[in-house]
Amino acid sequence: MEKQAEKQLEKQLESFILHLKRKTVVGSYQVSRASAELLRQWVHKGKWGNAKSLIDQIKIIGKKLMNAQPLEFCIGNIVRRVLFIIREEYLTFFRNKKNGLNNDDYDDDDFETTTSNNNNNNNNNNINSSSNINKNNKYSNVMLQDDPIDDQEDIDFTETFPRLKAAIMDSINELIDELEGLHRNVAEQAIEHIHSNETIMTLGCSRTVEEFLKEAARKRSFKVIVVETAPSLEGQKTAISLSKASIDTTLITDSAVFAMMSRVNKVIIGTHAVMANGGLIATSGTHTLAVAAKYHSVPIVVCTGLYKLCPLYAYDQDTFNNFGSPGEYLKFEEAEFLENVHSYNPTFDYVAPDLVSLFITNIGGHNPSYIYRLLQEYYDARDILEDE
């Protein structure tokens, strides 16, 4: 029975890796959700006897997933969160035993019930921000414990605790609940940041930004200027979606960004990843938008979930970038007349942190300078150092 379950897990892993390589699973949210579900199944059905064994297995799985799609930073982020959860739950049990406290709060089958409830509530995204803050504080207390991270090096995570699996499963379910509710949690803050008669500019196609603007439109009257984001033309999808929601929407070309920026009160965008220094890896064209906004002293607000928080650094436009086919904007028959021309189609832009005014996340607003603190609260330093 155990061998059959193990084979099934390996099959699921290989299938997901194949989907990542073929890009049949796309989008940071979908990839993050699928990664978290896979790791939950591995914790639930995998063969591991103690926390160290599980940590080693999750690291191996994480490397395989990240190698399959290196620029999907959210995969590594979810893996690091799960590793952080495993260590925190183990340390909780370890400290309780050390201090003579009871570790029998979890029933052996609690994780079965929690998993079932989680699956039944997939469509219930009405999770308020305060509840998510409380959940995250469960993992942020690493900075407040009696023994700091530096003193944990002598803990080998090999001791076994009967209730550990249930505790880890419960925490991973909370992580998945957080992913499910993040769009609503970000959107609930819209009224605080968008005021009547404002003109908002955005670009690309971000579900988080769309829901943020639609939520604000329920109580505010404002205009939205959408940059079409050539050559992918993702902005057209956003413009159509906002128009259907009865929001006054204007679609402009990328070249018109600077000319229109003087009329804008605020720029609201999404991002592919938030780097360790508070910079962004975002849709191509975002850097031009950000520079124009800074010139006109227009604040840039980034709507994102914290699952995009990445402990890596990007220093220029070439770091962590991908190049698409020039055929999207240059016809093949025209290429023969361009012998000495090199044509590039970058997928992403790097936006420096000094160009960003505010991050609106699923647990509230943060300045770019606060990102380093969030990294300490969400990831274990050992996993970050291993990535480097």
From Swiss-Prot:
One Pfam family, short name: IF-2B
GO cellular component: cytosol; eukaryotic translation initiation factor 2B complex
MF annotations from Gene Ontology: guanyl-nucleotide exchange factor activity; translation initiation factor activity
Single Gene Ontology BP annotation: cytoplasmic translational initiation
PANTHER family given in the database record: TRANSLATION INITIATION FACTOR EIF-2B SUBUNIT BETA
Function: Acts as a component of the translation initiation factor 2B (eIF2B) complex, which catalyzes the exchange of GDP for GTP on eukaryotic initiation factor 2 (eIF2) gamma subunit. Its guanine nucleotide exchange factor activity is repressed when bound to eIF2 complex phosphorylated on the alpha subunit, thereby limiting the amount of methionyl-initiator methionine tRNA available to the ribosome and consequently global translation is repressed.
Protein's name in the database: Translation initiation factor eIF2B subunit beta
